[in-house]
A protein has these predicted regions:
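Core alpha/beta nucleotide-donor-binding catalytic domains of modification enzymes
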Residues: 1-146, 150-173
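An accessory alpha-helical subdomain
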Residues: 177-181
Length: 181
């Protein structure tokens, strides 16, 4: 589906899962002229989330975009990793909204498939999960970077995504990004 068709397919009012990263900044800008947006930011209760919140807060304030913030509420079960717990909490927060769009892209799909296959359970990111929609799954991350660079938009990088000691980050940097660049 081309981007013009996508604009007309989405509802007029929608919520963007907004982290302040390049993908979510690009889709906020892309959708902003044709849709009534609300930004949904999830605070994980960490210093990294504090810095991300500052960026997201000022971005939304400067553009007049309503911002809704969710916070960690539940204790992490012993059988859950932190990453899994945070993801579950984020999706629980996003259930509060009628129609949510995320910035998941092709790189995310490939990374998730490789990582999950290495753990014996290969999965593909679905384009829809309840009220959460991922219309950009066929677009490589570079599309979002190019969009932001062409529009002189700034975004924030999450430093926790670059530490190679985590297998998912290693896959992202050394397999996916090298193959798609």
């Amino acid at each position: 589906m081309d981007m013009i068709q996508l604009l007309h397919k989405l509802p007029r009012k929608l919520t963007v899962a907004f982290s302040g990263g390049v993908d979510s900044v690009a889709i906020m800008d892309f959708l902003g002229n044709n849709h009534e947006l609300t930004a949904a930011f999830f605070h994980h209760g960490t210093d990294v989330s504090d810095h991300a919140y500052d960026f997201v807060h000022f971005y939304c304030r400067d553009r007049g975009i309503p911002l809704k913030v969710g916070y960690m509420r539940d204790q992490k079960p012993k059988d859950e990793s932190w990453e899994e717990h945070w993801r579950n909490q984020r999706y629980k927060f996003l259930e509060e909204f009628e129609y949510v769009v995320t910035g998941h892209h092709l790189n995310d799909c490939i990374e998730t498939y490789i990582w999950s296959a290495m753990h014996g359970n290969p999965i593909v990111i679905p384009d829809t999960r309840k009220n959460v929609h991922r219309p950009f799954l066929l677009n490589p991350k570079q599309t979002f970077i190019d969009w932001c660079n062409n529009k002189n938009l700034s975004w924030r990088e999450d430093w926790t995504n670059v530490d190679d000691k985590y297998m998912r980050n290693y896959i992202r940097k050394n397999v996916v990004e090298q193959r798609l660049s």
